[in-house]
């Protein structure tokens, strides 16, 4: 309190100095009355020690969100609400977009890529919370190109240093199969094609697990194998009415896109089922093919663990067996094997190798032939190559004497 002054309103002596911008004021701390007010500076000499402040720094102009960023933030929130995601997911996706927008590689990108960033942030949030959402579903909602979306997704994950777990295959099956329009009768859906959702989902899960155990899923996009498994599950529940329906027509009835490799995955899955069917006693008498084996998928899935062990053998075990075979060949010849004593036509078929399809049918690669080396006989023979042919000490001594005689003959001048 300077000089014992008091507040003229309340009479309090609790006066404090308060610097309001460039003015120094004396204010009562009890009632807030301004007792004295400083004088504004009017001369340049009084402002000699002050610093100028730019307009953008004083008003916070640079901290404002641009129109494009505001539009994309609204799109992030709208996309989360369309997908019916929880509020925490929406907040996380918005924060990821704000971080991604600060990256130079994203801010300077094309408009097509910036529009994809919205879906990438939502997909990252769903993957981190184990929410079943596919990249194809996001691309369909945003009308985005799948290649651009996948490359942008990987770039954002790498630049932000995020830990994104892979989507659980069972959750993906449930989410993807729920989009099939096969569970309610409609004018475009015949009654014989309508199926119970729970039955088809449970059988599809078993078929996808079988495909995973037999290396059909590893390193491949999951949607084609899920589409093929769903088609087989749907056919096997009522085979008499549905065996004539093709995969393309099935996808058209279900109102889903047919993935390009789905037909190949279907043939691979049918080949596995045929191999398993050959191990069941009551199916060995039947001549099953890739069409008739669909009728017995229920029995094959019921005993799939045992049938996979019987129908296939591990590729690593096969290699070890081949290495151990020369060691025990003498003992096998003495004891004899009853299998090889049977006639050739009655021998049981050896189990197939349980290996990925890329190893069972490797792609053809062009091999360049090495250039043919023409040997004329006039090539120089090095000393190291000659030493390889000298076996005994006597040969070494004879070779040294021959070399000495040759040098002596070369040093003798020719007679006149």
From Swiss-Prot:
GO terms for cellular component: nucleus; transcription factor TFIIIB complex; transcription preinitiation complex. GO terms for molecular function: RNA polymerase II general transcription initiation factor activity; RNA polymerase III type 3 promoter sequence-specific DNA binding; TBP-class protein binding; zinc ion binding. CDD domains: CYCLIN_BRF2. Gene3D superfamilies: 2.20.25.10, Cyclin-like. The modification Cysteine sulfenic acid (-SOH) is found at residue 358. A zinc finger (TFIIB-type) spans 3-36. The modification Phosphoserine is found at residue 350. Residues 317-385 are annotated as: Disordered. One of its GO terms (biological process) is cellular response to oxidative stress. Residues 354-360 are annotated as: Required for the formation of a ternary complex with DNA and TBP. Residues 362-416 are annotated as: Required for interaction with TBP and formation of a ternary complex with DNA and TBP. Component of TFIIIB complexes. The TFIIIB complex has two activities, alpha and beta. The TFIIIB-alpha activity complex is composed of TBP, BDP1, and a complex containing both BRF2 and at least four stably associated proteins; this complex inhibits the transcription by pol III via its phosphorylation by CK2; YY1 facilitates the TFIIIB-alpha complex formation. Interacts with TBP; this interaction promotes recruitment of BRF2 to TATA box-containing promoters. Belongs to the TFIIB family. PANTHER family: TRANSCRIPTION FACTOR IIIB 50 KDA SUBUNIT, TRANSCRIPTION INITIATION FACTOR IIB-RELATED. This is Transcription factor IIIB 50 kDa subunit. It comes from Rattus norvegicus (Rat). The gene is Brf2.
């Amino acid at each position: 309190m300077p000089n014992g002054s008091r507040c003229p309103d309340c009479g309090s002596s609790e006066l404090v100095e308060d610097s309001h911008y460039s003015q120094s004021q004396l204010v009562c701390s009890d009632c807030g009355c301004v007792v004295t007010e400083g004088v504004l500076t009017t001369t340049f000499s009084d402002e000699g020690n002050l610093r100028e402040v730019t307009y953008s720094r004083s008003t916070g102009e640079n901290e404002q969100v641009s129109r494009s960023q505001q539009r994309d933030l609204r799109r992030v929130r709208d996309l989360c609400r369309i997908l019916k995601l929880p509020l925490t997911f929406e907040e996380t996706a918005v924060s990821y977009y704000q971080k991604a927008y600060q990256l130079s590689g994203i801010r300077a990108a094309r408009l097509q890529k910036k529009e994809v960033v919205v879906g990438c942030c939502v997909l990252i949030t769903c993957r981190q919370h184990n929410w079943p959402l596919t990249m194809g579903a996001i691309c369909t909602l945003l009308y985005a190109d799948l290649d651009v979306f996948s490359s942008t997704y990987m770039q954002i994950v790498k630049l932000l240093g995020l830990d994104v777990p892979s989507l659980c295959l069972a959750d993906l099956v449930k989410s993807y199969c729920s989009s099939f329009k096969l569970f309610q009768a409609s004018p475009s859906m015949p009654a014989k094609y309508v199926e119970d959702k729970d039955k088809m989902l449970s059988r599809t899960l078993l078929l996808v697990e079988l495909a995973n155990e037999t290396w059909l899923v590893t390193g491949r996009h999951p949607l084609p194998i899920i589409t093929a498994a769903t088609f087989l599950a749907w056919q096997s529940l009522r085979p008499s009415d549905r065996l004539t329906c093709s995969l393309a027509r099935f996808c058209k009835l279900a109102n889903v896109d047919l993935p390009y490799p789905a037909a190949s995955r279907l043939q691979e899955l049918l080949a596995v089922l045929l191999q398993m069917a050959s191990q069941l006693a009551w199916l060995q008498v039947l001549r099953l093919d890739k069409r008739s084996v669909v009728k017995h998928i229920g029995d094959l899935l019921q005993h799939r663990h045992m049938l996979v062990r019987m129908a296939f053998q591990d590729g690593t075990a096969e290699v070890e067996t081949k290495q151990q075979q020369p060691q025990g060949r003498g003992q096998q010849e003495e004891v004899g094997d009853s299998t090889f004593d049977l006639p050739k036509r009655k021998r049981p078929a050896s189990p197939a190798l349980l290996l990925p399809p890329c190893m069972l049918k490797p792609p053809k690669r062009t091999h360049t032939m090495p250039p043919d080396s023409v040997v004329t006989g006039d090539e120089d023979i090095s000393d190291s190559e000659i030493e390889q042919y000298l076996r005994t000490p006597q040969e070494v001594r004879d070779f040294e004497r021959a070399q000495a005689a040759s040098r002596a003959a070369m040093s003798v001048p020719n007679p006149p």
